[in-house]
From Swiss-Prot:
PANTHER family, sorted: CARBOXYSOME SHELL PROTEIN CCMK4, PROPANEDIOL UTILIZATION PROTEIN PDUA
Alphabetical keyword list: Bacterial microcompartment, Carbon dioxide fixation, Carboxysome, Photosynthesis
GN (gene name): ccmK2
This protein's record includes keyword Membrane: no
Subcellular location: Carboxysome
Protein name: Carboxysome shell protein CcmK2
Domain annotation BMC: ranges: 4-90
GO cellular component: carboxysome
Domain notes: The tight homhexamer forms an irregular pore with an opening about 4.8 X 6.5 Angstroms.
GO molecular function per UniProt: identical protein binding; structural constituent of carboxysome shell
Biological role stated in the UniProt entry: Probably the major shell protein of the carboxysome, a polyhedral inclusion where RuBisCO (ribulose bisphosphate carboxylase, rbcL-rbcS) is sequestered. Assembles into hexamers which make sheets that form the facets of the polyhedral carboxysome. The hexamer central pore probably regulates metabolite flux.
Record carries keyword ATP-binding: no
Assembly mode: Homohexamer. Stacked hexamers, with the concave faces together, have also been crystallized. Interacts preferentially with itself, then with CcmK1 and CcmK4a in vitro. May interact with CcmL, this occurs at very high CcmK2 concentrations. Interacts with CcmN and CcmO in the carboxysome.
Upper lineage: Bacteria, Bacillati, Cyanobacteriota, Cyanophyceae, Acaryochloridales
Length: 102
């Protein structure tokens, strides 16, 4: 089963926290991290089965938009990322998140 990567980029930290919370509650995904981009941009990253990641990203977008001042800047899902990406980008399952892995 392919392990997909889902990302939501927001403007503002409260919106990304709301998105992350909704994402892990809506589907069987694991939150693997977040990245502060600068200028108020923050990206949250989840991993899981393709259909679960799709559902979680949709839920995260809806929730982030409800935050006062929250703005979703971009979303993306990579269904089957190449294994090399895991060693270069911050999308790996780390020891800290392993206990939450489905």
């Amino acid at each position: 089963m392919p392990i997909a990567v889902g990302m939501i980029e927001t403007r503002g930290f409260p919106a990304v926290v709301e998105a992350a919370d909704a994402m892990v509650k809506a589907a069987r995904v694991t939150l693997v991290g977040y990245e502060k981009i600068g200028s108020g941009r923050v990206t949250v990253i989840v991993r899981g089965d393709v259909s679960e990641v799709q559902a979680s990203v949709a839920a995260g977008v809806d929730s982030a938009k409800r935050v006062n001042g929250g703005e979703v800047l971009s979303t993306h899902i990579i269904a089957r990322p190449h294994e090399n990406l895991e060693y270069v980008l911050p999308i790996r399952y780390t020891e800290a998140v392993e206990q939450f892995r489905n």
